[in-house]
Amino acid sequence: MNPRDIVEQVTALAEPVAEQLGLQLVAVAYQTHTKPATLRVDIRHPTEGTGLDDCEKMSRALEALLDTRDDLIIGAYNLEVSSPGVERVLTTDREFMAFRGFPVMVKTFGPVDGKKQWEGRLLERDGENVYLTIAGRRVALPRPQVARVQLVQSLP
């Protein structure tokens, strides 16, 4: 099975496990450039900081489920369950949905309304724009202009 299929199937298995534990699945990656391969699962607690206990519970529950699916990943692999870093760069639709309301810094390729860096709370991302709330105002930044969206600890 190719890595993309593994990620899709593990995502389908891991999402309900995370929900049962009161967590959100943020991302799944299967890295084959390491020996053994690494299956990385990122989770977050929706209302408070994600702790080591959350990662441990998710790891044990997912590992037990994966052990019943010996057809999914052939050969040895390491399972790593962690929470996204505080200053994580957001790239996937899943990440943009999981981190709605969080403080972010957006860098653009060129000036948008005279600025190349924006800080605010993430509202959403659609096919055309990334939306932030800045000082109570909704701001739309065109996706083709957005170079990077990164979580930050707090807003200035």
Swiss-Prot record:
Its main location: cytoplasm. Required for maturation of 30S ribosomal subunits. Keywords: Cytoplasm, Ribosome biogenesis. It is found in: Cytoplasm. GO terms for biological process: ribosomal small subunit assembly; translation. Disulfide bonds: none annotated. InterPro entries: Ribosome_maturation_RimP (IPR003728), RimP_C (IPR028998), RimP_C_sf (IPR036847), RimP_N (IPR028989), RimP_N_sf (IPR035956). GO terms for cellular component: cytosol. CDD domains: YlxS_C (cd01734). This is Ribosome maturation factor RimP. Belongs to the RimP family. Pfam families: DUF150_C, RimP_N. The lineage of its organism: Bacteria, Bacillati, Cyanobacteriota, Cyanophyceae, Gloeobacterales.
